[in-house]
């Protein structure tokens, strides 16, 4: 009986959240954002390279810069963002309830999340995959040697589900050691509460930076899942979905056409029709999106193109020093590809 009641309460909670999200969508997020004068952006509780406060308390990371790009497009000012730190368990409810306008929090795009929670994924701003980190003193070379291991993992994530799938598929046993936040998971691993830590591979490199002795840990070579990470908005609000989607597309197109924060003003004199449409000089401009004509220019001038953002936050210009890999543009051996602005 208790189990039936629990299932019923869960169903009611999901139903209530979806009703709330429908009401928010009907009112229109774009109008709400323009009226309040800022974008309410859901981020992580702290993951270097993606969303993390620096020593001055200022939020930084590739997910943070997406929110700044969105604010630049809509409000003409990248600083018009209010950041809401959320755990993995809290993130979707915060979006469904209207507490945030966009979720930009290293979130994996899955069928269930895209269809059953009243949400829309804007696109992918980082292609990732789940891996494992262990202490070097264990002498492990492969994840296939983790049979019987204890594994630190964050709750409410695809990581937790993938972990179970991987060990079951390999016929191995493990003991999960579950935490609510990435920081807690990292501390648990660092203090020896588990043999291995699992999360997205980019996250492993980020969390390793915060260990007492980063050189004591190594990331194993196996990638056990596909983790397309990207921003999320409420379902049913097509106008806001379009604005959020084309913000990311503009950053990708800007990199493809060589438009950067440093040369964007000079590029206004370009004869290339692709660049002129990107900067709002010709073409559809902001009419279809319901925002300023120079929205693309504002994104690039204030934040930069996708490549600039990547290198600054997780790439060569960051402590993570992650190679572009599959996150390079399609014409440079990667997956990143944006539809044309025309």
Task: Describe each PLM feature range.
Residues 28, 81-93, 138, 176-191:
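Short helix-initiation/N-cap motifs at beta->coil->alpha
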Residues 68, 72, 76, 80-145, ...:
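Acidic, polar ligand-binding/catalytic clefts
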Residues 25-104, 291, 306, 329, ...:
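Extracytoplasmic small-molecule ligand-binding "clamshell" domains
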Residues 18-25:
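Sec/Tat signal peptide C-region and signal peptidase I cleavage site
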Residues 65-68, 72-74, 136-140, 144, ...:
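Extended ligand-binding regions for polar small-molecule ligands
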Residues 40-49, 59-74, 108, 128-184:
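Bilobed "Venus flytrap"/periplasmic-binding protein-like clamshell domains
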Residues 281-342:
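C-terminal functional modules
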Residues 8-18:
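Hydrophobic helical h-region of N-terminal Sec-dependent signal peptides
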């Amino acid at each position: 009986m208790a189990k039936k009641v629990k299932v019923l309460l869960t169903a009611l909670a999901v139903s209530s959240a979806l009703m709330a999200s429908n009401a928010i969508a009907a009112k229109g997020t774009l109008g709400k954002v323009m009226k309040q004068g800022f974008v309410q952006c859901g981020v992580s509780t702290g993951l270097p390279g993606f969303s993390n406060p620096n020593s001055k308390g200022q939020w930084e990371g590739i997910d943070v810069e997406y929110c700044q790009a969105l604010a630049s497009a809509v409000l003409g000012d990248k600083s018009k963002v209010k950041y809401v730190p959320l755990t993995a368990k809290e993130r979707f409810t915060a979006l469904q309830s209207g507490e945030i306008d966009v979720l930009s929090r290293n979130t994996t795009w899955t069928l269930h999340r895209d269809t059953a929670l009243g949400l829309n994924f804007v696109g992918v701003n980082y292609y990732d995959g789940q891996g494992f980190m262990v202490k070097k003193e264990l002498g492990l070379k492969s994840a296939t040697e983790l049979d019987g291991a204890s594994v630190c993992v964050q709750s409410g994530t695809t990581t937790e589900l993938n972990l179970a799938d991987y060990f079951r598929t390999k016929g191995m046993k493990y003991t999960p050691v579950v935490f609510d936040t990435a920081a807690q998971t990292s501390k648990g691993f660092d203090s020896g509460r588990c043999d291995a830590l699992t999360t997205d591979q980019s996250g492993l490199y980020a969390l390793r930076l915060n260990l007492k002795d980063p050189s004591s840990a190594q990331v194993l070579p196996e990638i056990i899942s596909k983790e397309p990470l990207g921003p999320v908005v409420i379902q049913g609000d097509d106008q806001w979905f379009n604005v959020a989607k084309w913000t990311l597309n503009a950053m990708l197109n800007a990199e493809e056409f060589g438009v950067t924060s440093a040369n964007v003003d000079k590029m206004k004199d370009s004869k290339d029709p692709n660049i002129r449409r990107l900067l709002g000089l010709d073409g559809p401009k902001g009419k279809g999106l319901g925002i300023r004509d120079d929205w693309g220019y504002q994104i690039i001038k204030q934040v930069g193109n996708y490549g600039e953002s990547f290198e600054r936050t997780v790439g060569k210009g960051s402590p993570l020093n992650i190679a572009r890999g599959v996150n390079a543009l399609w014409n440079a051996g990667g997956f990143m590809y944006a539809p044309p602005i025309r």
